[in-house]
UniProtKB/Swiss-Prot annotation:
Protein name: EPIDERMAL PATTERNING FACTOR-like protein 6
Subunit details: Interacts with ERECTA.
UniProt-listed PANTHER family: EPIDERMAL PATTERNING FACTOR-LIKE PROTEIN 4 (PTHR33109), EPIDERMAL PATTERNING FACTOR-LIKE PROTEIN 6 (PTHR33109:SF4)
Subcellular location: Secreted
Family: Belongs to the plant cysteine rich small secretory peptide family. Epidermal patterning factor subfamily.
Organism: Arabidopsis thaliana (Mouse-ear cress)
Annotated S-S bridges: C113-C147, C117-C123, C120-C149
Impact after mutating P122S: In chal-1; derepress stomatal production in a specific subset of tissues
Length: 156
């Protein structure tokens, strides 16, 4: 009654299998299916690593041939602290462009508003809160850049 197999249960098992697949052939078929699935999985993993974009096309990787030290300014409660971090120089940027990037600080850069306000002058970029389309009272609205001349705001 336990978990022992008797010869009658084996004969019953072999009689229920098709005549083309005996117990040893059935096991062999399962193993070959397992190896085919394993091979398919390995090929998928290899294809994933070979098809992914190179490091030069990623906007987050800053790889180059010449390495330089860069200064990064982190704002902390109204104070500006200098953090020295190893970075690599991208392409042939000039020192002024590198300095502008460092001094600009965190966040998005302001747009060029020279021709966005029409004939109105001076046209300056400003940060403005943008409420959502539906009327919702919130403590925080996301901010966006707009060009401002006088009391009017223009899309950059």
């Amino acid at each position: 009654m336990g978990f022992e197999r008797t010869s009658s249960s084996l004969s019953l098992l072999s009689s229920s299998l098709p005549s083309s697949l005996q117990p040893s052939e059935n096991t062999r078929a399962k193993f070959s299916l397992f190896y085919l699935l394993l091979l398919f999985f390995v090929l998928c993993v290899i294809a994933t690593f070979t098809i992914t974009p190179t490091s030069t096309s990623s906007p987050y990787n800053r790889n180059s041939n010449s390495g330089t030290l860069g200064n990064f300014y982190a704002k902390e409660e109204g104070k500006s602290t200098v953090v020295i971090k190893k970075t690599r120089k991208i392409g042939d940027r000039s020192k002024e462009a590198e300095l502008r990037r460092i001094l600009r600080g965190l966040g998005s850069s302001p747009p060029r508003c020279s021709s966005k306000c029409g004939r109105c002058t001076p046209c300056k970029p400003v940060h403005v809160p943008v409420p959502p389309g539906t009327p919702v009272t919130a403590e925080y609205y996301p901010e966006a850049w707009r060009c401002k001349c006088g009391n009017k705001l223009y899309m950059p």
